[in-house]
């Protein structure tokens, strides 16, 4: 669900309602009141740091590939910064909760927690999947997406958004979104036999709480949930792309 959740930011006309870390209406169709000066300064710093963090991950991947001459098991070269910066996105829930970013707390929580779940409850917890190529697949998709997304928010907050970044934000998802979803699904699928064998995070009866939980079945349900969500969200994003970029082109004609 991580790519699907993160992509909802782009599906709304302004990349998440100005939301997850940005401000303003990226479509340019109407102006929204942004955060105050102090909040804006903080958000700019936050987005710059997050952009830099994902750039560190990108550079780490490239350096590891050049050193090894292979793309296998590159996850280990960027494991720590990936965990740090993806977990750092939890601050975006706080941004919404205190009102400095005009996005839904519930939607933002879903977006952020789905990725944190995949990082910690799947990839970190099931060591055997960390060398899978599918992990690299979603890591690359996330990395490119986040560099663009945080750059987009930074320039939007500064009221100086280059068209190239706007175009990249509303175009590259066409490839990155399916790529990320594929990596996520394959990683969860690869984790299933190990989760079942170890009984990871599962609670069986009898116990004093009279409660049971099957983590293996839970992961299967998560995978099934991609079926209705992915196509609906993907085509909605395509529709939003046409609307937003066509508006930009029309605006340029009148300048």
Swiss-Prot record:
Regions crossing the membrane: 43-61, 81-98, 109-126, 132-147, 171-188, 219-236
Taxonomic placement: Eukaryota, Metazoa, Chordata, Craniata, Vertebrata
GO MF entry, a single one: enzyme binding
Annotated protein name in UniProt: Very-long-chain (3R)-3-hydroxyacyl-CoA dehydratase 2
Protein location: Endoplasmic reticulum membrane
InterPro entries documented for this protein: Tyr_Pase-like_PTPLA
Keywords: Endoplasmic reticulum, Fatty acid biosynthesis, Fatty acid metabolism, Glycoprotein, Lipid biosynthesis, Lipid metabolism, Lyase, Membrane, Transmembrane, Transmembrane helix
Ranges facing Cytoplasmic side: 3-42, 99-108, 148-170, 237-255
Region (May be involved in interaction with TECR): 199-215
Keyword set includes Acyltransferase: no
Ranges of compositional bias, category Gly residues: 13-22
UniProt similarity note: Belongs to the very long-chain fatty acids dehydratase HACD family.
Reaction equations catalysed: a very-long-chain (3R)-3-hydroxyacyl-CoA = a very-long-chain (2E)-enoyl-CoA + H2O; (3R)-hydroxyhexadecanoyl-CoA = (2E)-hexadecenoyl-CoA + H2O; (3R)-hydroxyoctadecanoyl-CoA = (2E)-octadecenoyl-CoA + H2O; (3R)-hydroxyeicosanoyl-CoA = (2E)-eicosenoyl-CoA + H2O
CC per GO annotation: endoplasmic reticulum; endoplasmic reticulum membrane
Designated gene of the protein: HACD2
Domain of life (superkingdom): Eukaryota
EC number: 4.2.1.134
Membrane topology, as annotated: Multi-pass membrane protein
Active site: 177, 184
Organism (species): Pongo abelii
Record's subunit section: May interact with enzymes of the ELO family (including ELOVL1); with those enzymes that mediate condensation, the first of the four steps of the reaction cycle responsible for fatty acids elongation, may be part of a larger fatty acids elongase complex. Interacts with BCAP31. Interacts (via the third lumenal loop) with TECR.
Keyword tRNA processing: no
